[in-house]
Each structure stands twice: as C-alpha cells, then as structure tokens.
Amino acid sequence: LITTVLDITWEVGRTGKLTPLAHLEPVDFMGVTVKRATLNNYDDILRKRVGIGSRVLIRRSNDVIPEILKSVDDGEPANPVTIPTCCPACGARVERDGVHIFCTNSLSCTPQIVGRLEHFASRDAMDIEGFSEKTALLLVNEIGISKIPDLYELTPASFSGLPGFGEKRIGNIPVSYTHLRAHE
C-alpha cells in the first residue's frame, strides 16, 4: 500500500533514545486507518530514502505495527530528514551511538522520567495496578516526581486534587502502594 509522508518527528523513550516517527497521509489498511509508522533510526531513514513528502510503501509488520518498507519515488528525497542536534522534549544536546541517537539529559527530560516510572510500575516489574503513562506524566508535571524513589514517598493525600483522581480512585491507591512498599 502506498501513502505519503507528511512529517517526521522524533520521540524520546525511557532510555533517552530518539526514534523517528513518520506521520502519514491516512490510509485504510486491513480495516485499520494507518496514520503513523516507525522508522527505527536515522540509518533506516537513509537506507529507505524517506523524507517529508516521500511516497512510501507500507505494510503492517506481523499484521500489527505499521512499517515503511521503502520510498517509491526516484532518487533522493526532495525534503531529506536531518539528525536532530538537540532533544525535541527538553532541548538538551544529543549524542549518536552507532545507529541510535540519545538525549544526554537523563535527569530532567520528562519523557525519559515518565518512561522509567511507567516501566517500574508495569506488570512485568512492580505491578502497580492502575499506574499508566498518563499517571506518570501527571505525577511528574503536578507533583514533581523525578525519580523512582520518589514513588515511595507518595500517600493517598498526594493525589488529592489531581485531575482524574476522585475519592474512589484515591481509595484504591493504598492497595497498590502497599504492594510497592512490600518490595522495599
């Protein structure tokens, strides 16, 4: 299936790795509207000759994840993508390590902090029920959580007044955070 790349942005993960994300002209593919696809890394962009405005061949890897296979345009892209010189989230400098690009600001780059908190609270780690990326972002932005040990200081009162935390949800917190403290 062929579509057009409208933009390419860079997302920051919990390890600080920047991953290029292609925003596509929406296209119906196997019953799903595909609007975005990963490009893995900068070398992948170059190898596939993808730029903004490129017409690209896409597929759904394992019938799930949208993937750009290649540009169907002749020659190099008219609007090539450049390597970012700073983190799109926090503005810190970036470093290249092989094919990957990393934000150097691991202490205060919000997407990295949110990603680490979410990973720590996930089912495969501490299994804190109801803790999501949205919750982590709220804790970082509203309470100032910046590292995993800060989670151990939270009490139900910490959540009072936060958007999405009514009495019922706050009442469920002790169960989850008692579980967290049990792993100390």
Which residues are covered by each model-predicted region?
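Conserved small/polar residues in nucleotide/adenosyl-binding loops
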Residues: 178-184
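A short amphipathic alpha-helix within small helical-bundle interaction modules
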Residues: 128, 139, 146-162
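Long, charge-dense accessory insertions within large macromolecular proteins
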Residues: 1-37, 42
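Short, charged beta-turn/beta-strand-edge "cap" motif at the junction between a beta-strand
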Residues: 57-66
